């Protein structure tokens, strides 16, 4: 996309980033009813979350700007660990592009720019999570070569107790 600026997020972007982060949350909640829903308290905490990300030395938040409007953003962090290999990991925590601007290469451009940061940290592997049922995310990340490695699973506590009771009664 021409006339697209990718730059580091700034403190002056925080309010818009909070709005976009909430849009992302709502978007993630749509395809899978089992996804945890954000509360009003959680919404109030988003500003603090964004500010903490901006302050992290080993993290980078980038924004895509078109005609003076933030149309997408990405956040990733670097971590070094000695207890597992690979040692240098890049984690993409957030990628969001506004609905009217998708499928124009903006997400790819944001990932490319974040990868410059990862390269400066000698990252060996990049990891991320996306919601099961989010076909756009599956397609986007799959096209970039990402393959699922692990699955997270949830159950309501009451249901787990019911299952455990039914198993006990069958024994």
Residue spans for each PLM region:
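Conserved beta-strand-loop-alpha-helix junction that forms the acyl-donor binding cleft
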Residues: 113, 127-137, 154-156
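A short helix-loop-beta-strand connector motif used in the catalytic cores of GNAT acetyltransferases and
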Residues: 48-63, 91
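Conserved acetyl-CoA-binding loop-helix of GNAT-fold acetyltransferases
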Residues: 94-97, 103-116, 143
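Conserved N-terminal entry element of GNAT/NAT acetyltransferase domains
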Residues: 1-15, 23, 162-171
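Conserved GNAT acetyl-CoA-binding A-motif
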Residues: 118-129
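Conserved beta-strand in the GNAT
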Residues: 63, 69-78, 96
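Conserved active-site alpha-helix within GNAT-family acetyltransferase domains
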Residues: 108, 132-150, 161
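Conserved GNAT-fold acetyl-CoA-binding loop/helix
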Residues: 25-49
